[in-house]
Structures are given as structure tokens and as C-alpha cells.
């Protein structure tokens, strides 16, 4: 009986050593595995500088994709907005800057399931690029360290419809003029009118593509950061009926 007891003790010691070995290995790996998950903040607060800086542009985009998957599945991360407010009050370290449309159905923070302090958001009808938006993107990336510039278009865009219909209305006229280059640049077979949803969406897609080119052309600051691999300039389309965000290219 004593011999059996000794063997049990020895086995227990081995089991403890094995457990500690595995645990230590897991602890060493865990930071690398979890840092890229911080856009899905739970109840701890906003992104820290260390967490944001540890991520590559590709990892940031992957997290935006995962956030959209959670949104579509109705399994969004639990959040304590008061904790996020407190943790971000002394400083912000967003991982991405999103240029989206003013459309009330396309709230980027929600469709990507990000919290307070996780993303810079700029919104204007038709997600058009102008000097103010470019300056905001440069601030987000060059001054604040964001890793991704994302232009987010969407289906059934009213601004795109207005550009197709050549709407003239106060200051809106000048804004729509920024979208109009996407109309002749869109290759489409079928009825080319604002009543054709497929055509409107095709023009909206082209509008995003042209916006990406315009950002690179008009902002040497962002273009240089992208060439260095510091940031990634990307485009995406949000589908109102499904909630899917489809990244371009």
C-alpha cells in the first residue's frame, strides 16, 4: 500500500510539473495571440497604446472583419461604455480611421463592433474625399498612430443616386460633383438610372475605388506611410440588407 501511495505522489508531482510547464508556455504565447483581439474589447476598456502598436495593418483589418461577423451573428462583444470612457479619457489609441457615408444606417462603430477609443470615424455624404477628410486621416495615422485607412461605401446610397440624377440643391451640388467621376468610370450593362439598384451599387463601388486612388494621389503623407508598410489604405462596401462588409481586392 505504501509503494502504491509513493507512486501516486510521484505521479501527482509529475502532473503538477506538466501543468506548470503547459501553463507557462501558454502565458508566454497568450499575449501574442490576444493582442490582435483587442478591438473586440470586452469590459476592460479601450485599446491601449501597447495593444494598438503591437498590431499590423493586416491584423487590424482582420479584427474589423471579425467584428462585422459578430455584428451579423448578433453576438457582439459585451461592453462597459463607462469603463471605456474612463480608460480613454487620458488618451486615445485607435487602430483605424474610417471614412464612411453620413447615411444613418451605416454606423461604422456598430457594424464593426468596436468601442469607444478603438476607431476614428469621419462621415460625409457619399464618403467623398476632401481636404478636411485628408487632414483628419493624416492626423489619425501620422500623428496618432492608426494602422488602417478604410473608405466604407454602402448599397442604396442616396448621395450616389443624387449624383446619377444630377441633383442641384445648394451646397449639396458641389458635394455630388465629387461623386460624378464614378459614373462614367463604372462598367455596367443594363439600365443606368437611379431606379436600378444594381447600377447604383456598381457606381458606389467605383466611387470607393476612386476615393482610394484620390487619397494616395492627394496625400503624400499617407502614400509614404503605406509604402513603408506602416499603414494600409483599404476600401469596403457595406450591404444594408445583409449587414455584410465586403472588403475590396
Where are these regions (language model features)?
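Gly/Ser/Thr-rich loops at beta-strand to alpha-helix junctions
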Residues: 104-105, 154-159
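Signal peptide processing junction and immediate N-terminal pro/mature segment
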Residues: 35-45
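Divalent-metal-activated hydrolytic enzyme cores
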Residues: 20-27, 31-32, 46-91, 117, ...
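Twin-arginine (Tat) signal peptide motif
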Residues: 11-20, 34
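Short beta-strand segments
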Residues: 99-101, 123, 150-154, 234-239
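Active-site alpha/beta core segments
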Residues: 90-97, 103-109
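N-terminal secretory signal peptides
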Residues: 1-14, 28
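Active-site cofactor/substrate anionic-group-binding motifs, chiefly glycine-
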Residues: 102-127, 132
Amino acid at each position: 500500500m505504501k509503494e502504491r501511495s509513493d507512486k501516486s505522489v510521484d505521479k501527482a508531482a509529475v502532473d503538477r510539473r506538466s501543468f506548470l510547464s503547459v501553463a507557462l508556455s501558454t502565458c508566454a504565447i497568450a499575449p501574442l495571440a490576444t493582442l490582435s483581439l483587442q478591438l473586440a474589447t470586452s469590459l476592460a476598456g479601450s485599446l491601449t497604446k501597447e495593444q494598438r502598436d503591437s498590431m499590423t495593418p493586416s491584423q487590424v483589418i482582420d479584427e474589423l472583419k471579425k467584428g462585422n461577423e459578430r455584428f451579423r451573428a448578433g453576438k457582439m462583444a459585451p461592453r462597459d461604455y463607462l469603463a471605456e470612457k474612463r480608460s480613454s479619457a487620458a488618451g486615445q489609441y485607435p487602430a483605424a480611421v474610417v471614412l464612411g457615408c453620413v447615411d444613418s444606417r451605416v454606423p461604422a462603430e456598430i457594424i464593426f463592433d468596436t468601442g469607444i477609443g478603438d476607431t476614428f470615424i469621419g462621415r460625409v455624404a457619399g464618403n467623398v474625399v476632401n481636404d478636411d477628410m485628408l487632414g483628419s486621416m493624416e492626423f489619425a495615422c501620422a500623428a496618432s498612430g492608426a494602422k488602417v485607412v478604410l473608405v466604407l461605401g454602402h448599397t442604396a446610397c442616396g448621395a450616389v443616386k443624387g449624383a446619377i440624377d444630377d441633383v442641384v440643391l445648394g451646397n449639396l451640388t458641389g458635394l455630388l460633383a465629387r461623386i460624378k467621376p464614378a459614373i462614367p468610370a463604372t462598367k455596367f450593362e443594363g439600365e443606368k438610372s437611379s431606379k436600378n439598384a444594381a447600377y447604383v451599387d456598381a457606381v458606389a463601388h467605383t466611387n470607393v475605388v476612386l476615393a482610394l486612388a484620390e487619397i494616395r494621389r492627394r496625400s503624400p503623407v499617407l502614400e509614404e506611410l503605406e509604402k513603408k508598410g506602416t499603414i494600409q489604405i483599404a476600401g469596403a462596401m457595406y450591404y444594408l440588407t445583409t449587414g455584410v462588409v465586403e472588403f475590396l481586392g
